């Protein structure tokens, strides 16, 4: 089946009353009158019909009903070449996109059209991008940990199954590699899949991610069905309508895997701030009065309509990892502040750790999780995590003294604390499966129980006599002894 998003039809078969024509174009915003009583519903997809009955060329989404059978719609692609008087067709449904296994290994735009030059998507399954959040009765309210196999995350800032995680990190600190490892691990440990939504970011970054996924095996070009991820891109150069809706397109694909295939799904949104930014642009184009700092008055509603659909149900779960850009590092800005209200955990990547060669460069002190409570994770996990944080915090406090006076000026207790902290810091590094082809080291998936055991043994002094190099880029604590003997 050839897929142009839900609009494969004979133009002649469309009811004449469902046709309108363009009377005004302001950038990506179109005004279209329809016959009396035939105005389309909010969020319906409209298609601008080109001259000479050629292919429909621009898809729009109804945003406002202006009265007198006139609607205002926002285009999902460039409006270059459109003119007043062009025919517009009401499809009668919201934008609908392909879903299911055939989406794996492919790249889509906001309309669900493949943009990877690998041919059409063979599927009859389409879902509208607008739908309600799951009803309360279908939600799974149990607080359970989503084990990632990544030591520093599982121990110090565990993810909630069906929760939302904010990923903070600048360029070059390992964000992409961490994302790919999470995609790989969920596929192996849970038989789950991932959906990546590129919202308003650089086209080059999207291309780099795709190439790296092919190199690491996350996308299998020979057998696309064995790929572990579907990609949906609405990049910086696209109109605000596309950037505002591409997150919903990715979420719709993820919901199918959760609700129909009953799988655990990872949904990546990079960047959630761009979703808000695009909504702000659309709001201004529609003539709404701006709210605080120029943002749209519907900011909380738009964010909630996206975030509330990301949840666990009795069928499966969607766990979302969202890159968060903080404008001017101002955490009180309405965009990040509204996002934080929905997050269960934060994973902060540290440039100083990356500079030391410690990967993943997750900052153990700045990363947080609402799940790290004794009644949720258990007393042993909580106690170990707190002791690790206290040790690392003390080491951080002593670093200025060490830089000026050296280790010899510290007390015996502080020297021991520093030695153990450096071993923990290195033990929390880990070789990744997706980096095997670059590093030559086989990847390691480490269970939470093994991580807790390893940190407990280091803190108890069991390995005080081993060099700290033995703890670098290993999996379980048992590998430390073997590595120390080889060295």
Swiss-Prot record:
InterPro entries: AAA+_ATPase (IPR003593), ATP-synt_VA_C (IPR055190), ATP_synth_F1_bsu (IPR005722), ATPase_a/bsu_AS (IPR020003), ATPase_alpha/beta_chains (IPR050053), ATPase_F1/V1/A1_a/bsu_N (IPR004100), ATPase_F1/V1/A1_a/bsu_N_sf (IPR036121), ATPase_F1/V1/A1_a/bsu_nucl-bd (IPR000194). The keyword Ion transport applies. CDD domains: ATP-synt_F1_beta_C, ATP-synt_F1_beta_N, F1-ATPase_beta_CD. It is an enzyme of class 7 (translocase). The keyword Plastid applies. Its EC number is 7.1.2.2. ATP binds at residues 169-176. It catalyses: ATP + H2O + 4 H(+)(in) = ADP + phosphate + 5 H(+)(out). It is found in: Plastid membrane. It comes from the Eukaryota. GO terms for biological process: proton motive force-driven mitochondrial ATP synthesis. SUPFAM superfamilies: C-terminal domain of alpha and beta subunits of F1 ATP synthase, N-terminal domain of alpha and beta subunits of F1 ATP synthase, P-loop containing nucleoside triphosphate hydrolases. GO terms for molecular function: ATP binding; ATP hydrolysis activity; proton-transporting ATP synthase activity, rotational mechanism. F-type ATPases have 2 components, CF(1) - the catalytic core - and CF(0) - the membrane proton channel. CF(1) has five subunits: alpha(3), beta(3), gamma(1), delta(1), epsilon(1). CF(0) has four main subunits: a(1), b(1), b'(1) and c(9-12). Produces ATP from ADP in the presence of a proton gradient across the membrane. The catalytic sites are hosted primarily by the beta subunits. NCBIfam families: atpD. This is ATP synthase subunit beta, plastid. The lineage of its organism: Eukaryota, Viridiplantae, Streptophyta, Embryophyta, Tracheophyta.
């Amino acid at each position: 089946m050839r897929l142009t998003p839900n609009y494969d039809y004979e133009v002649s078969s469309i009811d004449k009353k469902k046709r309108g024509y363009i009377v005004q174009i302001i950038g990506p915003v179109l005004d279209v009158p329809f016959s009396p009583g035939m105005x389309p519903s909010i969020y319906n997809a409209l298609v601008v019909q080109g001259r000479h009955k050629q292919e429909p060329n621009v898809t729009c989404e109804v945003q406002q009903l202006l009265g007198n059978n006139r609607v205002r719609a926002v285009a999902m692609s460039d409006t270059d070449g459109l003119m007043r008087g062009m025919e517009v067709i009401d499809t009668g449904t919201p934008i609908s996109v392909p879903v299911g296994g055939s989406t794996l290994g492919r790249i889509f735009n906001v309309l669900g059209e493949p943009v990877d030059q690998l041919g059409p998507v063979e599927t009859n399954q389409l879902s509208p991008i607008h739908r309600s959040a799951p009803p309360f009765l279908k939600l799974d309210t149990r607080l359970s940990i989503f084990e990632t196999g990544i030591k520093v995350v599982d121990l110090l800032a565990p993810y909630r199954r069906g929760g939302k995680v904010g990923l903070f990190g600048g360029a070059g600190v390992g964000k992409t590699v961490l994302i790919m490892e999470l995609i790989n691990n969920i596929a192996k440990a849970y038989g789950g899949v991932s959906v990546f939504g590129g919202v308003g970011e650089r086209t080059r970054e999207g291309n780099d991610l795709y190439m790296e996924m092919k190199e690491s095996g996350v996308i299998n070009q020979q057998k696309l069905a064995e790929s572990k991820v579907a990609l949906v891109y609405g990049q910086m150069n696209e109109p605000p309508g596309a950037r505002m809706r591409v997150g919903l397109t990715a979420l719709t694909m993820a919901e199918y895997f959760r609700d129909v295939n009953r799988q655990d799904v990872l949904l990546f949104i990079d960047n959630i701030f761009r979703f808000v930014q695009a909504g702000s642009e659309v709001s201004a184009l529609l003539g709404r009065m701006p709210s605080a700092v120029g943002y749209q008055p519907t900011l909380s509603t738009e964010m909630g309509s996206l975030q509330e659909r990301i949840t666990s149900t009795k069928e499966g779960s969607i766990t979302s990892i969202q890159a968060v850009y903080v404008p001017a590092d101002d955490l009180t800005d309405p965009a990040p502040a509204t996002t934080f209200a929905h997050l269960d955990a934060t994973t902060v990547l540290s440039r100083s750790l990356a500079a030391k060669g410690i990967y993943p460069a997750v900052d153990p002190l700045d990363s947080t999780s609402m799940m790290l409570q004794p009644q949720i994770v258990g007393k042993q996990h909580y106690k170990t995590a707190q002791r690790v944080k206290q040790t690392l915090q003390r080491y951080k406090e002593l670093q200025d003294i060490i830089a000026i006076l050296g280790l010899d000026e510290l007390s015996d207790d502080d020297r021991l604390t520093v030695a153990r902290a450096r071993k923990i810091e290195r033990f929390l590094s880990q070789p990744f499966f997706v980096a095997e082809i670059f590093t030559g080291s086989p990847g390691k998936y480490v269970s939470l129980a093994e991580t807790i055991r390893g940190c407990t043994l280091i803190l108890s002094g069991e390995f005080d006599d081993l060099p700290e190099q033995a703890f670098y880029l290993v999996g379980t604590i048992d590998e430390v002894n073997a590595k120390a003997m080889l060295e």
